[in-house]
Amino acid sequence: MNPTIYTVAYPECDARDLQTIDTWRAANDSTGHALVRPHFTLVFACNAVDEATYLAHVAAVAARTAPIPFHCRYAMLGADAHSPRAHAYLVPDEGYAALSLLHDALYTGPLADAMRLDLPYTPHITVGTFETAPQARKWCAARNHAGVSVPGRVAAVWVGQVVDGQFEHRGQFGLMG
């Protein structure tokens, strides 16, 4: 059986912005905070191919993709249709298309059949998980009222899997295109 692997991109941001995101995650998503640092998930829980094939594919996509500048200015409610829980996301307006295109490029070739077509992709950094959607909505509304501004860039993608409650890296690939 193939391992369950993810591809993420860690944002490069001002240290104060990363500290703010980390503080929000520690307060509102302790499980995610302990698992992995702030990130955009690009490939979700994939076990469609062996690790060597997966890594080679991600390396090839990264080699032809340029670094992606982004700017998150919106805290968005992410409701879970299968649970009363809900999430708070930081969503980029600048960089949205480029991150989405990177996601789409990763789900080609050997990963093409692994893409979930029933869930639209929204690039985001999860900053909270709440017991109810109204709680998440209230948190997002407060952030948006105060003003959200997190500029940065994505310069690499990381492949990894969850091992003993931690995201263990299997490879890092710079965006070189």
Which residues are covered by each model-predicted region?
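Short, exposed beta-strand-loop hairpins at the edges of beta-sheets
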Residues: V159-V163
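Short, basic/glycine-rich phosphate-binding loops at helix/coil junctions
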Residues: G78-Y89
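Basic, often amphipathic N-terminal segments
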Residues: M1-H71, D93-V150, E168-G177
